[in-house]
Amino acid sequence: MLDYIKSAHDEMTEVAGHGRSAMIDKAAAKLKSDGWKLVETTGFLHLIGPLWQRVVDGAHEYALVTEDKHHNRNGLVQGGVLMTFADRTCGMTAHYVSGKRPLATVQLDTHFVEAGKIGDILISRPRVVRSTRSLIFMSTEVTVDDRCIVMANGVFKFLKGPE
């Protein structure tokens, strides 16, 4: 099985590898020119990023340019990348709108609507559905060129700590 996965990866890299870096650089330049800023990330998210962010009319928006490292064995964006992007962007927005209170995901419902392709620019525009003293309910659609590819709803618990 591992040989099959390695073989599929090698074939995809050969087909898609040439010019991939230029495509990523072009997407990054487009994001910068549209007012996006790089988000400093650490830990697991650092492996998936770079992540981009901007605020438009008070609403937080996030972008991720999909690269070869995000592919599954079918050459499409791996579902875990899409889930992580939805979770992280909902969590970041919840953190900002709550006055930077610490929080943790307690539930994330994810619906895959369409496949993401390597080279796509994923966009997430999370919104608060409801907030209580201990929980905040978030929702987002992950889009590519205004087409919804993922719908996600998350529940986040506020943690004790600096408020």
Where would I find each of the regions flagged by the language model?
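Terminal targeting signals and extreme-terminal segments of soluble enzymes
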Residues: 1-163
